[in-house]
Swiss-Prot record:
The gene is nhaB. It comes from Escherichia coli O6:K15:H31 (strain 536 / UPEC). It catalyses: 2 Na(+)(in) + 3 H(+)(out) = 2 Na(+)(out) + 3 H(+)(in). Keywords: Antiport, Cell inner membrane, Cell membrane, Ion transport, Membrane, Sodium, Sodium transport, Transmembrane, Transmembrane helix, Transport. The chain crosses the membrane at residues 23-43, 52-72, 97-117, 120-140, 144-164, 202-222, 238-258, 303-323, 348-368, 391-411, 447-467, 475-495. Belongs to the NhaB Na(+)/H(+) (TC 2.A.34) antiporter family. It is a multi-pass membrane protein. One of its GO terms (cellular component) is plasma membrane. This is Na(+)/H(+) antiporter NhaB.
Length: 513
C-alpha cells in the first residue's frame, strides 16, 4: 500500500536522518522566531548553539542542510540581512577561492602523493620510523596543501592495500565486498585484525600530522587564511608569527608519535604483518613493471607543479585560490585530462564544504548584528594583556574541539579586530591575539572528529568501517595528542610567544603594520 502524502513528505525531509533529528530541527525552526520576538540576544545565542549542534551531528546529516535552513530563517525574521551576508562572503572571497580551486588542483596531483605514501609504507620496516614518516609527510604536505586532500590520499592508499590483502585472504580474485569476512579462515582473520590495527594507527598519525602542519602556514587550514587576511600577513609573515608556538608543538607532537608507538599506548604499536608485506610488495613490483613512460612523465610533471605551488605560495605571487587555479590548468594540460566530466570530479570534494562555509558566514553576520560575543570579549579584555592571550587560546580551544574551526576562528578574529579598531587593544596586542586565536582554534581541535575536518572526513570515509575505526576509538587514539598539543600550545602562548615575537622584530624579520 502506498504511503500517505504527509508520510512521504516526512521521509523526504532530510532523507535518511533519524526521526528525532528531523523533529529537533523542526522545533528549532518553530522556536527561534518566537524567542527572537522576546529577546533577540537570547535568540542569537540559541541559533549559534543549534548551529554547533548540526556540526556535532555531522554523521547524522551533512550540516549544510539543517544549518542552511536555520540561516535562511535567521535572514527572513531579521536576525541579519541578506546584504550583510553578501558583505561577509565578499570579505572572505579568498577563502572560498582556496576551497574551490586549491583542493581541486591538488586532486590532479593525487598520483604523485599516492606514489610518495606507497613508497614510504613499503620501504620503511621500523613501525616507529614509519609512523614518524607518515606524520612528518602529512604535516609537510598540509602546510602547503589542503588537509582534506592529504587525508584523502592516505585513505586511498590504505583502502587499496586493504583490498589487495583482503582478496588474497578470502581466496577470491573478484572480492568486491571488503566488509565481508565470511570467506576468510581463522588464521587469515588474526593477520587481518593485526593489519587493521596497523592501518588505524597510521591513519591517526597522518591525521594529527595534518593538524601539526596545517597550523603553521596561512594555507594550511581555511581559517588560517581568514586570520592572515584580518592581520594583513603574507605567507612568510604568518609562518614566522606562528613559529614561537607551532615549532615547539610540532617537536612535541612528533615525540608523542614515537612515544605512543614505543609504549603501545592508546591502541598504537601494531606492526605490519610480514605476510601482508609480502603480498603488498608483490603487487607494487607488478605495478611498477606495468608503469609506462607516459605514466612516469605524469609523475615528473606533477612533481614540477608541486615545486611551482610551494614557490608561488612562499613568494605570494598571487591570491591562494588563483595559484590553485593555475595548478588545475597546468596539471590537466600537461597530463592529458581534457574531458569536462573528469575535470568536474575534482570539484565534488570541495564544493559542499564551500557552500557550508557560506552558511557559516550567515551565522557570523547574525553574531555581529546581535553583538553576541561582546560580553565574552569584554570579559577577556578586562584581563591584563598577558592574560588575554591565554584566555583567547582557551576559549577558542574549548569551542573548536566541538565545533568547526573556520566558524570559531572567524568569530574570534572578527571580535579581536573590532576591539583593536575601537581602541580597546593596541595593534601589537591584536597581532599577538591573532596568533593565540589561530593556534587555539587549530591545536585543541584534534580532540574530536567534530573539530578537525580531516578527522571527520576519515570517520565518514569507506575506510573507517573496514579498519574498525569508530568515533569513540578515534577520540581515544587522539587523546595523547590532544593533551600534548593543547598543553604545549598553551605554555608557548603564555611564555614564549611575546618574547620571541619581540626578538623577531628586533632582528627585522617581522614588522608591525
Amino acid at each position: 500500500m502506498e504511503i500517505s502524502w504527509g508520510r512521504a513528505l516526512w521521509r523526504n525531509f532530510l532523507g535518511q536522518s533519524p526521526d528525532w533529528y528531523k523533529l529537533a530541527l523542526i522545533i528549532f525552526l518553530i522556536v527561534n522566531p518566537l524567542i527572537f520576538l522576546i529577546s533577540p540576544f537570547v535568540a542569537g545565542w540559541l541559533l549559534v548553539a543549534e548551529f554547533i549542534f548540526t556540526l556535532a551531528m555531522a554523521l547524522k546529516c551533512y550540516p549544510l542542510l539543517p544549518g542552511g535552513l536555520l540561516a535562511i530563517e535567521a535572514v527572513f525574521i531579521g536576525m541579519t540581512s541578506a546584504e550583510h551576508v553578501r558583505e561577509e562572503v565578499a570579505a572572505n572571497l579568498e577563502v572560498l577561492l582556496l576551497l574551490m580551486f586549491m583542493v581541486a588542483g591538488i586532486y590532479f596531483m593525487k598520483q604523485l602523493l599516492l606514489f610518495i605514501f606507497t613508497r614510504l609504507l613499503l620501504s620503511i620496516r621500523s613501525k616507529m620510523l614509519l609512523s614518524l614518516s607518515f606524520c612528518v609527510a602529512a604535516a609537510f604536505l598540509s602546510a602547503f596543501l589542503d588537509a582534506l586532500t592529504v587525508v584523502a590520499v592516505v585513505i586511498s592508499v590504505a583502502v587499496g592495500f586493504y583490498g589487495i590483502y583482503h582478496r588474497v585472504a578470502s581466496s577470491r580474485a573478484e572480492d568486491t565486498d571488503l566488509q565481508d569476512d565470511s570467506h576468510i579462515d581463522k588464521h587469515y582473520k588474526v593477520v587481518l585484525e593485526q593489519f587493521r590495527g596497523f592501518l588505524r594507527s597510521l591513519m591517526m598519525h597522518a591525521g594529527v600530522g595534518t593538524a601539526l602542519g596545517g597550523v603553521m602556514t596561512m594555507v594550511g587550514e581555511p581559517q588560517n587564511l581568514i586570520i592572515a587576511k584580518a592581520a594583513g600577513w603574507h605567507f612568510g609573515d604568518f609562518f614566522l608569527r606562528m613559529s614561537p608556538v607551532t615549532v615547539p608543538v610540532l617537536i612535541c607532537g612528533l615525540l608523542t608519535c614515537l612515544l605512543v608507538e614505543k609504549l603501545r599506548w592508546f591502541g598504537y604499536g601494531e606492526t605490519l604483518p610480514e605476510k601482508v608485506r609480502e603480498v603488498l610488495q608483490q603487487f607494487d613490483d607488478q605495478s611498477r613493471n606495468q608503469r609506462t613512460r607516459q605514466d612516469k612523465i605524469r609523475l615528473i610533471v606533477q612533481a614540477i607543479i608541486g615545486v611551482w605551488l610551494v614557490t608561488a605560495l612562499a613568494l605570494h605571487l598571487a591570491e591562494v585560490g588563483l595559484i590553485g587555479l593555475s595548478v588545475i590548468i597546468l596539471a590537466t594540460s600537461l597530463t592529458g585530462v581534457t574531458d569536462e566530466h573528469a575535470i568536474g570530479k575534482a570539484f565534488t570534494e570541495s564544493l559542499p564544504f564551500t557552500a557550508l562555509l557560506t552558511v557559516f558566514f550567515s551565522v557570523v553576520a547574525v553574531i555581529i548584528d546581535q553583538q553576541l560575543f561582546s560580553p565574552i570579549i569584554q570579559f577577556v579584555l578586562q584581563a591584563s594583556e598577558h592574560a588575554q592571550l591565554s584566555l583567547f587560546y582557551i576559549f577558542n580551544g574549548l569551542l573548536s574541539s566541538i565545533s568547526d574551526n573556520v566558524f570559531v576562528g572567524t568569530i574570534y578574529i572578527n571580535e579581536a579586530k573590532a576591539a583593536m579598531e575601537s581602541g580597546a587593544i593596541t595593534l601589537k596586542q591584536y597581532e599577538l591575539l591573532a596568533v593565540a586565536i589561530n593556534t587555539g582554534t587549530n591545536l585543541p581541535s584534534v580532540a574530536t572528529p567534530n573539530g578537525q575536518a580531516a578527522f571527520l572526513f576519515l570517520l565518514t570515509s569507506a575506510l573507517a568501517p573496514l579498519i574498525r575505526l569508530s568515533y569513540g576509538r578515534m577520540v581515544w587514539m587522539a587523546l595523547p595528542y590532544t593533551l600534548v598539543l593543547t598543553l604545549v600550545g598553551l605554555l608557548c602562548v603564555e611564555f614564549t610567544l611575546a618574547p620571541v615575537t619581540e626578538w623577531f622584530m628586533q632582528m627585522g624579520w617581522i614588522a608591525t603594520l
